[in-house]
Amino acid sequence: KIFLLQTIEDGEKPMESNDPKIEVYPIAKKDFDHGHTRAYGASLSKADYVMFMTQDAMPVDDRLTQELLKGFTIEPTVAIVYGRQLARPDADITEKMTRIHSYPDKSSLKTKADLEQLGIKTYFCSDVCAVYDKKVYDELGGFVYPTIFNEDMIMASKVIQSDHSV
């Protein structure tokens, strides 16, 4: 199932889905909170894995989900896998360099052992596109809220501190 959480203004009519696999849940703009909204979405799911993706994410092909799920087969401790974010072709040089630095072209596995070398960057996790092992997510209490940004990084810190990996 796909759960679409749509932020709406007062009086705005929520979108409707004609696909039985897609359920739309409107959230009043005044009630929106990054951590709480994602926690709400996760609570709707009965799946083994939950994926969070922002409305402006543009997958480069139709293999995004299956490629992300492969990350969970690398090591049994993996609890979060996030997607690589590329700069748009028309982006300025700062945007391009930021994406290259934050999202290198090689995957990595981050654990508590990386804290000495990477510091806080050990906890980096994209808030644009990430998949969570639902069992671990639930065991760790899910997203913290209220949270206005970095909800995925906060969750990644909980995952790594509990001896899981990202």
Where do the protein language model's features map onto the residues?
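Acidic donor-binding segment of Leloir-type glycosyltransferases
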Residues: K1-A28
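Glycine-rich, basic loop-to-helix element that forms the pyrophosphate-binding segment
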Residues: A28-S45
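Conserved nucleotide-sugar donor-binding
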Residues: K46-A47, S126-L140
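Conserved donor NDP-sugar-binding/catalytic core segment of glycosyltransferases
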Residues: D62-K96
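Short, flexible, basic/aromatic active-site loop/helix in glycosyltransferases
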Residues: G83, H101-T122
